[in-house]
Regions:
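A conserved beta-strand-loop-helix scaffold within acyl/acetyltransferase catalytic domains
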Residues: 145-195
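Acyl-donor-binding surface of acyltransferase catalytic domains
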Residues: 54-128, 227, 249-251
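A short, well-structured alpha-helix characteristic of acyl/acetyltransferase catalytic modules
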Residues: 127-139
Length: 256
């Protein structure tokens, strides 16, 4: 695992650990050394996770994770760092590789691209703003109204935590979302999305410029994220480098 991939991987684990501690989440520890099942009570697989260092993966722990989510009737994802031996234990209990994320990073000193000059940015601080953030994120990622209660509750809990939720604003209209999670010298970017009607108008580049500004403000060395296949071209255009795949094992065929 190279340093850049390691920064992406470690930031993801820290972010999921922060979600584990929220009132809107339900979790179960899997190993004394670390690792857990995390339910956000969402019906979306990508909102429910198993996090376990690959050297701690065993068939017994995989079966425990299956029971945890099976009892709740929820889909989930289980990321692994590349093609490692732990994958066989997951396949052995019936999980399959259902998709891959790309580990990507960008030096915090990079020059932001121009775009979306009409946009301003707002840090989510109130319950009303959190619910608005949740609605925009849900729609921007392709969800249909109404916004699930689990998504609304999760956003409200995240807004009250050390995680930083941001909204891109066109006047008083919220048009994009992102979430920032710091760990050591990395700043993780999550829930980065723009409403369909504002795509290809510079909004996403302007949002990335705001992320870069925040990274410099925090003294971060590197911005990290896990990109879906659909997001990789944009992040490459924004200057991100790819560091390898993160396979997602799941009990569902639909993980994005």
């Amino acid at each position: 695992m190279n340093d850049c991939f390691g920064a992406v991987w470690s930031n993801l684990g820290t972010f999921l650990g922060a979600l584990k501690g929220l009132s809107a989440s339900e979790a179960m520890d899997l190993a004394p050394e670390g690792g857990f099942c995390l339910s956000t009570r969402s019906q979306s697989a990508s909102e429910n996770w198993v996090w376990l260092p690959p050297d701690l993966v065993t068939p017994e722990r995989a079966e425990a994770a299956l029971r945890f989510f099976g009892e709740r009737g929820l889909p989930f994802v289980w990321p692994l760092p590349g093609d490692c031996g732990a994958a066989e234990a997951l396949r052995g209990v019936g999980l399959k590789e259902a998709g891959r994320l790309e580990a990507m990073s960008l030096p915090a000193g990079a020059a932001p691209e121009r775009g979306g000059k009409e946009l301003t940015f707002r840090t989510v601080r109130t319950r009303e703003e959190a619910l608005r953030w949740a609605s925009v994120a849900w729609l921007a990622f392709g969800g249909e109204p109404p916004v699930p209660v689990s998504v609304l509750n999760g956003a409200e809990a995240m807004a009250a935590s050390p995680l930083r939720l941001g909204m891109a604003m066109a006047g008083e209209e919220a048009v994009g979302t992102f979430l920032l999670s710091s760990f050591e010298a990395s700043l993780g970017v999550y829930y980065f999305a723009v409403l369909p009607e504002y795509r290809r108008r510079g909004a996403a580049m302007a949002m990335m410029g705001e992320v870069l500004r925040a990274a410099k403000e925090l003294g971060t060395e590197r911005i990290v994220l896990q990109a879906t296949p659909a997001g990789v071209p944009f992040y490459r255009a924004a200057g991100f480098e790819a560091h390898g795949a993160i396979p997602l094992f799941s009990n569902s065929d639909d993980v994005f």
